[in-house]
Curated annotation (Swiss-Prot):
InterPro entries: Metallo-B-lactamas, RibonucZ/Hydroxyglut_hydro, UPF0173, UPF0173_UPF0282_UlaG_hydrolase. Keywords: Hydrolase. GO terms for molecular function: hydrolase activity. It comes from the Bacteria. The lineage of its organism: Bacteria, Thermotogati, Deinococcota, Deinococci, Thermales. Belongs to the UPF0173 family. The keyword Iron does not apply. This is UPF0173 metal-dependent hydrolase TTHA1283. It comes from Thermus thermophilus (strain ATCC 27634 / DSM 579 / HB8). Pfam families: Lactamase_B_2. Disulfide bonds: none annotated.
Amino acid sequence: MVEVRYLGHSAVLLTDGKTRIVIDPFLTGNPMAALGVGEVQADLILVTHAHGDHFGDSVALSKKGGVVVSTFEIATYAEKHGAKSVPMNLGGTYRFEGGWLKWVPAWHSSSFPDGTYGGMPMGVVVELGGKRIYHAGDTALFSDMRLIGEMGLDLALLPIGDHFTMGPEDALKALELLRPKKVVPIHYNTFPPIRQDGEAFAQRAREKGVEGHALKPGEVLRLD
């Protein structure tokens, strides 16, 4: 069994009871954050791209014992600021106790708030506790999502905010390519430009045969 806790915006915490993985830990300064940095402990800290609302508290969490896993550029930046890191890139697979993760493409941009280049933006597929979870990061719809879907996804975490990423209509089209068993919308309602109705998206996903869950920050979805 794997627990998926939505922390707000694009931040999620995954655990199988042994390994704890946080993705895009934007907590400090996040008006929707369910937990603060002091309440989150992670073994692996996955960062899909360098924008501040995704890199977030990666360094602070690493200093508590976690390892930042991301692009070469982001990992190097994190190390310079005192984090432990594993530099990777698109297509690479990292194995850990109880599972693995693989970086896949995303269509977006990636730079730190100070303008430092963050490498290519990415999505990630995580296998943990026998479940496969796709976190799309920030992305537009793209046809190669079909290849990601061939990995056999138990859950897809998809941005629906529009403006900076795909919106609900494109995210629904993404479901046709990805064919996950379940979907959770992310990256919406944090700021005015990305206001969306998560429950309406989840309902439309269910109409397409995908189990949709619009989690509130702090809520947990269990994958049995």
